A protein has these predicted regions:
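Conserved adenosyl
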Residues: 14-20, 24, 96, 105, ...
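Short acidic-aromatic active-site loops that bind/stabilize oxyanions
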Residues: 65, 203, 356-360
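N-terminal accessory segments
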Residues: 1-186, 226-232, 375, 385-387, ...
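Short beta-strand element of the conserved SAM-dependent methyltransferase core
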Residues: 392-396
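C-terminal alpha-helical "lid/dimerization" subdomain adjacent to the S-adenosyl-L-methionine
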Residues: 327-374, 379
Length: 397
C-alpha cells in the first residue's frame, strides 16, 4: 500500500523542513525549533503508510513500558556510568535479570533511540540514555506510567458510562473510577508516599527544557518597576510546591526588597529545602482565605488547571480578597490553548489533567470568563517562545 500523498506534496513538505531548519540554524530561537520539529513530523506522517501508522499507534504504549522497566533495571544508569560499550549479559547482571527479557526491552529502547547499539548485543549510551538518569525525567516517567497509565486505560469505559459528557468535580473522575476511590488526587496521593514523591519531583521540572518565564516575560517592566519598596511582601508563590520557581526568581533578582513567601500544604513544605533566609514558608489551603495581604505579585503555576471552573472560582475569590486593587498583580503560568493549529504538548497535558484531576487546560476565552467571573480583569496574555506555558497577567477589576 502506498502513502496517501503525491511526490509534489512530499517535495513541498521537504521544502518546509529545509526552510524551517534554516531559520532555526540562523536564529537559534525556540519558536523556530518548534516550527522545524512540526515540519519534520508532517513529512514523517506523509511518508508513513496509513495502515502502518495505525499499527505504530496501537503498539506505542510499549515504548513507555520499556522505558519504565529499564529504569527499574538500572539500564540507563549503568550505560551512562560505564560511558562505553556494555554487553547484554553485563546489563542483565546488574539486577540478576534474564538476558532474554533484557534483550526484549533493549530492542524497543534501541528502536526509539533511547539506547545505542554498537555491536550484536552490545549497547552504548545516547543523549536520551543520559537524560533518563536525571531525577526529574525519572519522576515524570514513574508518575505518568504508575499513576496515569492505569487510569488512562479506563477512560473510554468511564466516558461510555457517563454518556460522553465532559467530567466535572475533583472526586468523580477517571482516577476515582479506575482506583475505586471517592477522594481527590490531592487527598489520595499522600497515602501513597512513593507516588507522591514522584509527583512532587515531577512538578520541579514540569517545564521540561522550555525556557523559564523569567527569561522572556518583562518582569522588571511589568512587576518590579511598580513595586512599593516599603511594602512588606513582594511575591507569594501560591501552592508553589517545593519552591523551585520562587528560588529561580530569587536567583535572578537576588537584591529585590520584600518578603518572598512559599505557600503550600504542610506535608509539601516539609520537603522544601529552599533558602530559609529569604524564602518564608506559609502553610496554606487554596480553598481558605489567602493569609498574605497586599503583595505585589501573586504567582500561580500549574495550579488552576488542576481544578474545575467551579472550584477555581472559589480559589480565585479567596485570593482576590487579599489583593490590593490597582497594585497587586496575579501572574498565572499555564498553557493557553490555541483555537486552531494548536501544539500537541498542551493537548496531551489537557488529557492528563482529566486523568489525574478531572480538570482541563483552557483557551484565552475560557481563561477570560473564569477570571472575570471571580472579579479579575485580564491585562494581557503573554505568549511563550515555542510551545510551552504562557503568562496571564491579571488584576482586580
Amino acid at each position: 500500500m502506498a502513502t496517501t500523498v503525491s511526490d509534489e506534496s512530499i517535495d513541498q513538505l521537504q521544502n518546509q523542513v529545509t526552510e524551517s531548519l534554516g531559520a532555526f540554524r540562523s536564529q537559534r530561537e525556540e519558536i523556530d525549533r518548534v516550527a522545524a520539529l512540526k515540519a519534520a513530523q508532517r513529512l514523517v506522517n506523509a511518508l508513513q503508510k496509513p495502515q502502518d501508522s495505525v499499527y505504530h499507534l496501537a503498539y506505542s504504549p510499549t515504548h513507555a513500558m520499556c522505558v519504565r522497566i529499564a529504569i527499574d533495571m538500572d539500564i540507563f544508569a549503568t550505560l551512562t556510568e560505564r560511558n562505553g560499550p556494555v554487553s547484554l549479559d553485563e546489563l542483565a547482571a546488574v539486577k540478576k535479570a534474564s538476558p532474554i527479557l533484557v534483550e526484549r526491552v533493549l530492542r524497543i529502547l534501541v528502536g526509539i533511540d533511547y539506547v545505542g547499539e554498537c555491536d550484536t548485543r552490545v549497547y552504548i549510551a545516547t543523549t536520551m540514555t543520559r537524560q533518563l538518569t536525571d531525577r526529574l525525567s525519572i519522576s515524570v516517567i514513574k508518575f505518568i506510567f504508575d499513576v496515569g497509565m492505569p487510569t488512562l486505560a479506563k477512560v473510554p469505559e468511564f466516558l461510555r458510562g457517563h454518556d460522553h459528557r465532559n467530567p466535572e468535580g475533583a472526586t468523580t473522575g477517571p482516577l476515582q473510577f479506575a482506583e475505586k476511590i471517592d477522594e481527590s488526587i490531592w487527598t489520595w496521593l499522600p497515602q501513597n508516599p512513593e507516588k507522591l514523591d514522584s509527583c512532587n519531583t515531577f512538578m520541579e521540572g514540569d517545564r521540561g527544557a522550555r525556557p523559564s518565564w523569567l527569561e522572556w516575560f518583562p518582569v522588571e517592566e511589568r512587576l518590579l518597576c511598580g513595586a512599593n519598596p516599603d511594602a512588606e511582601t513582594l511575591m507569594v508563590d501560591v501552592a508553589g510546591g517545593r519552591g523551585h520557581d520562587l528560588a529561580a526568581f530569587l536567583a535572578r533578582y537576588p537584591d529585590v526588597p520584600g518578603r518572598l513567601v512559599l505557600e503550600d500544604l504542610p506535608h509539601v513544605l516539609e520537603e522544601s529545602t529552599m533558602d530559609a533566609e529569604r524564602i518564608e514558608k506559609q502553610a496554606f489551603d487554596l480553598f481558605k482565605p489567602q493569609p498574605i495581604h497586599g503583595a505585589r505579585i501573586y504567582y500561580m503555576k500549574f495550579i488552576l488547571h488542576d481544578w474545575s471552573d467551579e472550584e477555581n472560582h472559589a480559589i480565585l475569590t479567596q485570593l482576590a480578597g487579599a489583593m490590593e486593587q490597582g497594585y497587586s498583580k496575579l501572574i498565572i503560568e499555564e498553557f493557553v490553548l490555541a483555537d486552531r493549529d494548536g501544539a500537541m504538548l498542551p493537548a496531551m497535558w489537557d488529557w492528563e489533567m482529566m486523568i489525574f484531576c478531572n480538570s482541563m487546560e483552557r483557551s484565552k476565552s475560557h481563561w477570560t470568563r473564569l477570571l472575570e467571573g471571580a472579579g479579575f480583569q485580564v491585562i494581557k496574555f503573554w505568549a511563550p517562545p515555542g510551545d510551552g506555558q504562557g503568562i496571564i497577567e491579571a488584576e482586580l477589576k
